[in-house]
Regions:
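A structural signal for well-ordered alpha-helical segments within the folded catalytic domains
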Residues: 17, 59-63, 142-146, 162-171
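Cytochrome P450 heme-binding "Cys pocket" and the immediately downstream C-terminal segment
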Residues: 30-33, 140, 158-202
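Central I-helix of cytochrome P450 enzymes
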Residues: 1-39, 68, 99-103, 153, ...
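Active-site proximal loops enriched in glycine and acidic residues that flank catalytic Cys/His/Asp
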Residues: 80, 103-104, 125, 149-150, ...
Length: 214
């Protein structure tokens, strides 16, 4: 009876953290927000909110979810694993019982998988020439990133997390425009794309923004 609520609560902090990073991306890369607004206007219109029934028809929003998880993983060193037997990797001996951390941050920036400019927030990297969601690289099993982990200890709530991010992003962009704040002189307040605090998750530090009705 407790499994579902605990699973939901367990994923709330990471989803909240991801939404914070995504909103920062909307401030830093307004062209991606404009493209998402255009897709929502064309598919959903202004008479109703987006729903999960729109999921197949919103490839850019779905790509935006993948890119947010790729761009700023909330667990940049993944979940610890332990080797079950002695092993060798590239000349290095790994004894049985060794605690292993995966550098998800670095893996998500592999240019051979993700192309150039992996530091930039670019949902289009997940789209094909026709604008549909492209098939994923086999190494990441269509997830589009390494942020959900590997093997038997990958994220059990990854599908729920994807769905939560999709509907939150779609509804928020349908309803609002996310804009940078200005100081008293009319200049944009600076953005720190690398500002973060460690609270167990990789959480964005404070920043300022405006939400305007879309």
């Amino acid at each position: 009876m407790l499994f579902v609520p605990l699973r939901s609560v367990g994923g709330a902090d990471t989803t909240s953290a991801m939404m914070g990073w995504w909103m920062l991306a909307m401030l830093a890369y307004p062209e991606t927000q404009a493209r998402a607004h255009a897709e929502l206007d064309a598919i959903v219109g202004r008479a109703r909110l987006p729903t999960f029934a729109d999921y197949p028809h919103l490839p850019y929003i779905r790509a935006m979810v993948k890119e947010a998880l790729h761009w700023r993983p909330v667990a940049p060193l993944g979940v610890p694993h332990q080797s079950t037997e002695d092993d060798w990797y590239e000349g290095m001996f790994i004894p049985k019982g060794t605690l292993c951390l995966t550098n998800v941050w670095h893996m998500n920036r592999d240019p051979e998988i993700f192309g150039k400019n992996t530091e930039h927030f670019d949902p289009a990297r997940y789209l094909d020439a026709s604008g549909d969601l492209a098939s994923g690289v086999s190494d990441i099993k269509d997830q589009g990133h390494f942020s959900y982990g590997f093997g038997r200890r990958n994220c059990v709530g990854r599908h729920m997390a994807d769905d939560s991010l999709f509907i939150n992003i779609a509804v928020m962009l349908w309803a609002t425009k996310i804009e940078r704040k200005k100081d008293g002189s009319g200049r944009f307040l600076p953005l720190d794309l690398d500002g973060w605090v460690d609270v167990g998750d990789f959480v964005l530090a404070d920043y300022h923004m405006l939400l305007r009705r879309s």
